Amino acid sequence: MNTVVKLNNIFSGLPKKKKTKVLGRGIGCGKGKTSGRGHKGQKARSGVSINGFEGGQQSIFTRLPKRGFNSLFKSKYSIVNLSTIQRLIDSKKIENVSAITKQVLFNLGVIPSIKEKIKILGDGKLNTAVAIEYDFISKSAGSQVTLLSSVSEDKV
């Protein structure tokens, strides 16, 4: 069954952009006079939309109970995987594997700030022995790495 392509049966797909309906241009257009906003009221006026307002009904966020809080003193950790460190060693971006400090990781763009604490995770495998400065480490990463801790006695 061969179908011949003719000019009248070419389908180029749906239109890329739907034309916007012109509002307020007479009752004949279907969206004239009130332009789909109904009559009067706050929502009929321009520049007004009230977030969470449900027409006098108690809003959903006041019906639900308050739960939890965000601590102001929460520590933020920069997570570094072993696979990331190995990739940097393989690409010769880290030359001195005996002293991988926060400054080195910051300069390479691995961590966003030197002030943040570093947590080493054991995702991936290390092929070379490294000494790395860290604040926290997972058990799986600790078994793979010879470590130089930045907080040896300060650790709580």
From Swiss-Prot:
It comes from the Bacteria. Residues 34-43 have a biased composition (Basic residues). The keyword Flavoprotein does not apply. One of its GO terms (molecular function) is rRNA binding. GO terms for cellular component: large ribosomal subunit. Keywords: Ribonucleoprotein, Ribosomal protein, RNA-binding, rRNA-binding. One of its GO terms (biological process) is translation. Residues 26-46 are annotated as: Disordered. SUPFAM superfamilies: Ribosomal proteins L15p and L18e (SSF52080). It holds the Pfam family Ribosomal_L27A. InterPro entries: Ribosomal_uL15, Ribosomal_uL15/eL18, Ribosomal_uL15/eL18_sf, Ribosomal_uL15_bac-type. Binds to the 23S rRNA. NCBIfam families: rplO_bact (TIGR01071). Belongs to the universal ribosomal protein uL15 family. Part of the 50S ribosomal subunit. This is Large ribosomal subunit protein uL15.
